[in-house]
C-alpha cells in the first residue's frame, strides 16, 4: 500500500456524497472479502466537519497505515493485500490480514487506545463472512470526544464544540506525534 501524498482536494463533502461514499466503501469491502477469505481491516480517519480530505487527514492516515503494518509484523500476521485511496469521505485503507478476526480486532482496539493518534482513527475489522466486529462486542465504551470526556457521538450530535477547536486539537496531536517521530 502506498502512503498518500499530502496534496489533498479540500472538497467540502455533502451528506448525500458522504452516504454514497460509505455505500461504495461497503461494496469494496465485500469484493475484497470474496477475493481474500481472511479478515479485512478497513481504516479511515475521524474527521469532523465537511472537509474530509486535507493535508492533516492524509498525514494522520499515513501514520495509521504505518502503525497497522507494524502491528501485523509484530504479531507475525501476513498482509495478503493492501490498498489506499481517497474518496469523498477522505482517506481509506484496506488490508487483508491472515489472522484470527477476534485477535485482530482486540489488537486494533489496543492500537487505537495506545497510539497518540489512535482517537483519530476508525479501524473496522470485518470477519471473512463480512460481519463487522464492534467495540460493543467487547463491552467497550463508545469513543471519547477529542476535547472532553463525553461520548464523541453525544458531542457531535449536540454540536458541543466549535469545529475550529476540534480541528486545532487534531492538528496539535499530529504535530506532537511528528515532533516525537512516533509511528
Curated annotation (Swiss-Prot):
<dbReference type="GO" id="GO:0051191">
    <property type="term" value="P:prosthetic group biosynthetic process"/>
</dbReference>
<protein>
    <recommendedName>
        <fullName>Apo-citrate lyase phosphoribosyl-dephospho-CoA transferase</fullName>
        <ecNumber>2.7.7.61</ecNumber>
    </recommendedName>
</protein>
<comment type="function">
    <text>Transfers 2-(5''-triphosphoribosyl)-3'-dephosphocoenzyme-A on a serine residue to the apo-acyl carrier protein (gamma chain) of the citrate lyase to yield holo-acyl carrier protein.</text>
</comment>
<dbReference type="Pfam" id="PF03802">
    <property type="entry name" value="CitX"/>
</dbReference>
<keyword id="KW-0808">Transferase</keyword>
<keyword id="KW-0548">Nucleotidyltransferase</keyword>
<comment type="similarity">
    <text>Belongs to the CitX family.</text>
</comment>
<dbReference type="GO" id="GO:0050519">
    <property type="term" value="F:holo-citrate lyase synthase activity"/>
</dbReference>
<dbReference type="InterPro" id="IPR005551">
    <property type="entry name" value="CitX"/>
</dbReference>
